[in-house]
């Protein structure tokens, strides 16, 4: 809080008055991140896409945007959660919100998926393939471009979830 107050040129009491606590700061950072990534709007666009492949292309793009614009936010969350129980609670809440949002998308898209997949299975596959850690592994440590990741994710989601023609 002290660093934020110093950087903003305000008293620490002002920071507390606005954000209340560390969770409030993390929520504000996350809100800006969601806005910058545009991923929620892309998911809404995907939900009205009548073509299953097009739907998954859009969510691959949304996922790429989410992690591409969120690397610093993820580092902030991880670092804060490692040392502060309040921040750990906020991280847990954020991840639960992500699961809920993705599960909603899967439920709304389930008519496109392979018949042998339950909604729970499709959700688990989808959530696993769209983890930040997977994006980070491929783009940061394995030399993939964000375009490579997006193309791979779209193809892999289609292979894993869609009925084959």
Q: What do the PLM-derived regions correspond to, one by one?
A:
Residues 1, 30-37:
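Short, basic, alpha-helical segments at the C-terminal edge of helix-turn-helix-like DNA-binding modules
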Residues 109-156, 164-165:
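Hydrophobic/aromatic-rich alpha-helical bundle segments in the mid-to-C-terminal region
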Residues 39, 70, 132-135:
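Alpha-helical transmembrane segments of polytopic integral membrane proteins
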Residues 2-6, 48, 80-84:
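Helix-loop segments that flank and shape redox-cofactor active sites
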Residues 61-78, 85-112, 120-124, 156-162:
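Amphipathic alpha-helical packing segments from all-alpha helical-bundle domains
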Residues 1-24, 28:
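Helix-turn-helix
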Residues 22-24, 28, 41-68:
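Hydrophobic alpha-helical connector segments
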């Amino acid at each position: 809080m002290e660093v934020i107050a110093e950087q903003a040129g305000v008293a620490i009491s002002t920071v507390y008055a606005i954000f209340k606590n560390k969770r409030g700061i993390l929520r504000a950072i996350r809100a800006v991140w969601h806005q910058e990534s545009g991923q929620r709007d892309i998911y809404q666009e995907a939900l009205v896409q009548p073509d299953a492949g097009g739907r998954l292309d859009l969510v691959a793009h949304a996922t790429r945007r989410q992690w591409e614009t969120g690397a610093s936010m993820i580092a902030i969350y991880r670092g804060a959660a490692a040392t502060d129980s309040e921040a750990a609670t906020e991280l847990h809440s954020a991840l639960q919100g992500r699961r809920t949002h993705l599960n909603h998308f899967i439920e709304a898209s389930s008519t496109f998926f392979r018949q042998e997949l339950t909604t729970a299975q499709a959700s688990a596959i989808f959530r696993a393939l769209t983890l930040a850690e997977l994006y980070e592994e491929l783009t940061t440590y394995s030399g993939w471009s964000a375009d490579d990741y997006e193309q791979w994710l779209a193809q892999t989601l289609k292979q894993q979830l869609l009925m084959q023609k």
